[in-house]
Regions:
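An alpha-helical, amphipathic repeat domain used for nucleic-acid recognition
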Residues: 1-142
Length: 142
């Protein structure tokens, strides 16, 4: 397959949403594109600004945080997409504090033990949930 065909496949995959370099590489591999050609296509698209793991990390982290996800869930999502841990860490640093995001979710859902479980399942850290556990111990939740 020619470089142009591989680039067209890659651009088609990027048509509706950002993909990490690893995700795009896997898609091209599944379509039978050889390793050297995939590498060349990924470099070309990165230079042109079509593929950026850093941009993906920041936009995806912000979107997940807006949807009420904690840092652990965001980290798992991004690393599962093949984004480097360093880029994930930088993206998480730009987000609003996890405790503030957890409090916003709790204000919307109500302060209850079920909300604490919900937040834990959504990847919020124990540190972010300490406020809620303290309220529960004081009898303020429930």
């Amino acid at each position: 397959m020619g470089d142009r065909d591989a680039i067209d496949l890659a651009l088609g995959a990027l048509r509706f949403r950002d993909l990490s370099a690893a995700e795009l590489d896997a898609r091209l591999d599944a379509r039978g594109i050889e390793c050297a050609e995939r590498h060349e296509v990924l470099e070309t698209l990165a230079r042109a600004g079509y593929v950026s793991d850093e941009r993906l990390a920041h936009t995806r982290a912000a979107a997940l945080a807006e949807r009420g996800c904690g840092d652990a869930l965001i980290r798992v999502d991004l690393e599962g997409r093949g984004v480097a841990s360093e880029l994930v860490g930088r993206a998480l640093e730009t987000l609003e504090a996890e405790r503030v995001r957890a409090e916003r979710v709790a204000a919307r859902r109500g302060w209850s033990p079920a909300t604490i479980r919900y937040l834990a399942a959504r990847g919020f850290s124990e540190e972010a949930l300490e406020t809620f556990v303290a309220r529960d111990a004081d009898g303020a939740i429930g």
